[in-house]
Amino acid sequence: MNQHFSKIHRFFLITLACLASLCVQAAPTITRLTPPSELFSNGQAAPVIARFLPGQRFDLQATIRPDAADKQIISATFSLDGKDILAPTALKNCEALCIKGLPANAMLATVRAFSVDAPGLHTLRVNATQSDGQTVSAQGNFEVVTLVKGGQKIKNIIILLGDGMGAAQRTAARIVAGGYAQGKVIAPMAMDTFPVTGMVKTASLNSIVTDSSPGMTAYVSGNKNNNNSEGVFPDDTLDSFDNPRIEYLSEYLHRTQGKALGLVTTADVFDATPAGNAVHTSNRGAGTGIVDQYLDDRGLTGLSVLMGGGRKWFLPASVPGSARGDRTDYAFSSTDAHTADIVKRWGAAQGNLDKDRNLLADFQAAGFTYTADKSSLDTIDPTKTDRLLGLFALSNMNVALDKIDGRRARVLGQSGRVVDDYGFPDQPMLDEMTAKALAVLDRHKKGFVLMVEGASIDKQAHAMDTERWLLDTIEFDRAIALAKAYAQGRSDTIVIVTADHECAGVALIGGSRVSDSRLQALVREGSGTALRNEVVGVYEQAGFPKYKIDTDGYPQTTDIDNRILVGYGSNADRMEDFRTNLQPLQDNQQPFTKQEPLSTYPSGLLARDQEGKYMITGQVPGDSATHTATDVPLSAFGPGAYAFTGVIDNTDVFFKLAQVAIRGVVPLEGMIPVPVRVQRKPLP
């Protein structure tokens, strides 16, 4: 009897389960909603991830997956705070160019160049309909930041970006260039004379450790980007140039006030930091499209000055040394609304796969005066120049140490000076480029945004080449001094000095206890860890390293007795002898690195400083030191500077700069726009 009842019971349960499964139908899903939000990702209203200025343009996008391969998404609409968004929604399926894992019938719904004027927290909803009539919806949120009515508006914004420059890099440069006497600085760095300093949190949208692309774009878009992305939110396509865009500070101020944009760097101009002020791409390495966008979208950004390295992107592919190629370029479809709306609604250029384009000639045809070296830069009359293009190397410019040694005729290269080996012996210093940029931009009566980057503070910290990043920090500070002098006495210019992130976990561990001659002897002995034990002085043994500064503003030599000693926290394996490296590591961005004389340069961290036989085991994999997640200092000068105190997010910088440029400087009370605070419920 019990056995019979048990069988009936099991049959009854199985039947109920089967009936229940028939009642649960598959449904389409929304896997991404842009702008990004915690409301969409985790069901929490806070923290608010995306923030915008009133009227700042940005794209909306949703990725929608049907519940079966034989079904389609036939419509999608967006609404804001319960009201339908009337702007056209472009639908694109994933038959091609979507990321792995998305079915071919997945659909992207996009609204381009959307904006909201009303400040406050807004709820965004997307509703989609499947071919069988099923519907799906999802919601997220974003904030439009309130700007406070102030007094005088700032005309000019100068952003000085020391790539990878943390507090330790600033301190090291102060010790070398300024010197200490009984614990007091003898000559302060220019950046140390700014009246206001705060600390900046540097995380990107997808990591606590940012790279340079989102590190820069956070400052000039007000939003987090993924690593490797510039001025865009992430999406689900493989196209590097179709991502949802965010309007930059330069674009917003050019559109609303007519301001010009200047970009000055010691890197290749396609690099992350300069591009992160004017270019929209999810791939910081797509150089051909990046430099084309500089020129073709200058009507959006107001680009008037562009200086640095990177000539390889401006030469037709047939010219030796050119890096142009269709694989790093773009051409938007004129019939597919997904990209056609970038052209139609943003006013962006359509692009073209044109590896044989002579971009250098096109810049000149557009009215840019071109300079290829310091000598020609010096001859340019800024009173007669509205637009300036300077390209001083095929890729990254040589670093300050090698440029200074070149000017001093110090032979360190294979065929002469290092700058001779690279083929560009007459490169300007960063301060010389900055001076000319300011003189040209000063002609723009509606004002300007100027970004100046000390790029190889980061690049040489990656290589753990202490003296090279040290002198690049000094070079950067000389540019800071010029920017401060320009703003001094004016009431219309704000200057900020900061970094996108820290690089290499630089630690000032002390000073050498021996003379340079003794250090050389220890290296020749190949004494390994005994080298460290005799040389490294900590605490009072470090003393005060004393560098003699030449009339050009740089140390006469970096190989002094009792030198400063630097360690690295995010280091890869390396050989170390504590002396200045005669040559930099090979730069794989240079077109002729694998040819002599550049091929004779050290190929990596374990290929240099071998004589001393002292190897330091790294804490990170690979062959390079890495960025760190530590906060970085920000110093400010000029009207509105006092908004930059405290510990702030990197995206806050954008809104503080916008405040003084759009609504004017306000008193300390109520000066800083306060983001909307939303109660975050604990996760279940």
Where do the protein language model's features map onto the residues?
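A post-motif C-terminal structural segment
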Residues: 94-101, 155, 162-217, 270-683
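Aromatic/hydrophobic beta-strand junction motif of beta-rich domains
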Residues: 58-68
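Exposed beta-strand face motif in extracellular beta-rich ectodomains
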Residues: 120-124
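Bacterial N-terminal signal peptides
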Residues: 13-21
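Short, compositionally biased P/S/T/A/G/V-rich stretches that sit at domain boundaries
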Residues: 26-54
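Short, hydrophobic beta-strand segments
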Residues: 102-118, 144
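Solvent-exposed serine/threonine-rich low-complexity stretches and specific carbohydrate-binding patches
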Residues: 81-104
